[in-house]
Amino acid sequence: MPSLAQLAGLSAWLAAAMTVVGMVTLLLFFSRGGRWGAVNDASSVVLMLALIPVALVLAVIQLEVVTTTALVVAAIGIAAMLAVAVLQALLVLRRVTYDQTKAAVLGGTAVLGVWYLLTALVSGSTAVPDGIRIAGAAAGIGFIVAGYGFAVGGERHPAAAAGWLVAFVATLVFQAWLGWLLLTRNLVVPDWNA
């Protein structure tokens, strides 16, 4: 049976792959429309669910330093991940429309940005490398700025475009690097069952 670290490492890589799929299909959807929206929504469901083991393993690492704070940060992130996954799944299943979920998905994505930012801050005294923390902070800021830009001016607003670009690059770095460290066992994850 794989350890939490191995599961989280694989999940981080899956999240990185879905980030690429999501960005490409989002661009295709906004430029061409059609089925690309459904593909983007489906990739978002997988991405959000893949991030849950990542949030859990980071909480385990953070618990060595900041107990209650680590649990609160993980709860914020997992709640946002589940909310966005459910909303996007309902969209894929055509139970709701894009207009019905847009505000809630943007809000959930902004909360996801808060999770990335808080994770970067809370991981300061842990074994998580500074580069991953910086990427997490950049991703968090990117998601928050993108949500703001989208809310005030739509997908073509400069803040939305800049925020998505920063979030895209930063989350790729965060997910791919963290996944590699977890899978190669180059990041210490406490094992309380030893």
What name fits each language-model region?
Residues M1-A194:
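Hydrophobic, aromatic-enriched alpha-helical segments typical of multi-pass transmembrane helices
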